[in-house]
């Protein structure tokens, strides 16, 4: 099979990369009605599989789970989760032939085997759903022409999808119809009903394409979302300890620092995150972030180039075929790093202390978010998509590090994200070591003293922060989510 994106001509590639439309609330007036009375069969019962299924059932849809025969007979975790939540469970052969919509929510690595198993069992005119388009775009999976292929991609982990639904809200979501598989022209109606059933329509929906979702998703997770957090954690910890900081304190400052810093990012973007600093610290964080952007820009561009060309995917799929040798080696090496094995700090670190003593970490977040966004937009991805795949998801990933350090992050994210994370961090750590050697007192681990600042310089820095394109689009999208949340709570 050929990489689907590489079979398109340049005009088609640009059109699909640039497909992004923020959908109005009135477009979801019918809710999930298009799928009511139809049979929806979910394949896979992991975090997305279970939590999307719970939401869809609560929205009035007929949901069941198709699992491999051995998963049922051996009562594996997927079988236990589905049955404990009261769902009907059966084998592929028992459930797929009656399904109107088959939703494939297994890991990327399993998609080809799953799709090749279920396709022959699907009835004529049925629909196949994904929450990530890797199998279609990068693997180039060929789907029967009578089958409609759609995507609903929540921009949050599965647990968050469920929690927001229970609060009467939802999570921002991308939806798409594969242009090669929409024989009856009903793909968008199916996708809209599916996303409404998950609650995503209450938080904002982007009509996108399989191509735009995959290329932007890969770029975000490899660079700012996972790779930058891993590289930053290792670099900052080693720097602190080398300068005499207690390893336990250094570990806590970093482990919980990312979450604290990005909580401000979630509420008010880069502007609010930078506003948490004193004026001298803000000026220093800005200067550091500009240096970091200059150093890292070629690395971010290389990752985007390799994602667009398919070089990244072909390399990762070769590792799949080699029993994940590279992935497992990198995972083991990460687990042995000084940061991962450092003792826990029993004392308390106040919220503001994370900002005051983490100026470099704030600079890394700012540089990484802006670079990921800029690199995606320069490659033809629309700003709204680039925002969701950079700034929006960062607090969610930072939260996983706060739970169990890098181990937890790499367990929670997909194998695809983990592989890309290692590629980036293994290149980024040596790249930034000369920069780390030139840091000044107050950049990390101690606060920058209060002092006089140049008013004109502070004005210009504030203007530069606020006028960046990601701040403009972010303010619009966060405002929409806030407005929608008020409506959901009120109604």
Swiss-Prot record:
Reaction(s) catalyzed by this protein? (2R)-2,3-dihydroxy-3-methylbutanoate + NADP(+) = (2S)-2-acetolactate + NADPH + H(+); (2R,3R)-2,3-dihydroxy-3-methylpentanoate + NADP(+) = (S)-2-ethyl-2-hydroxy-3-oxobutanoate + NADPH + H(+)
The KARI N-terminal Rossmann domain covers: 15-208
Gene3D superfamilies in the record, alphabetically?
Answer: N-(1-d-carboxylethyl)-l-norvaline Dehydrogenase, domain 2, NAD(P)-binding Rossmann-like Domain
User: In the Enzyme Commission scheme, what number(s) does this protein have?
Assistant: 1.1.1.86
List residues binding Mg(2+) 2: 217, 389, 393
Binding-site residues for substrate, renumbered to this chain: 414
Which Gene Ontology terms describe the biological processes this protein takes part in?
Answer: isoleucine biosynthetic process; L-valine biosynthetic process
> Known InterPro entries for this protein?
6-PGluconate_DH-like_C_sf (IPR008927), 6PGD_dom2 (IPR013328), KARI (IPR013023), KARI_C (IPR000506), KARI_N (IPR013116), NAD(P)-bd_dom_sf (IPR036291)
The Gene Ontology terms for molecular function here are: ketol-acid reductoisomerase activity; magnesium ion binding
Gene Ontology cellular-component terms listed: cytosol
The KARI C-terminal knotted domain sits at: 209-344, 345-484
Q: What is this protein called?
A: Ketol-acid reductoisomerase (NADP(+))
Taxonomic lineage of the native organism: Bacteria, Pseudomonadati, Pseudomonadota, Gammaproteobacteria, Enterobacterales
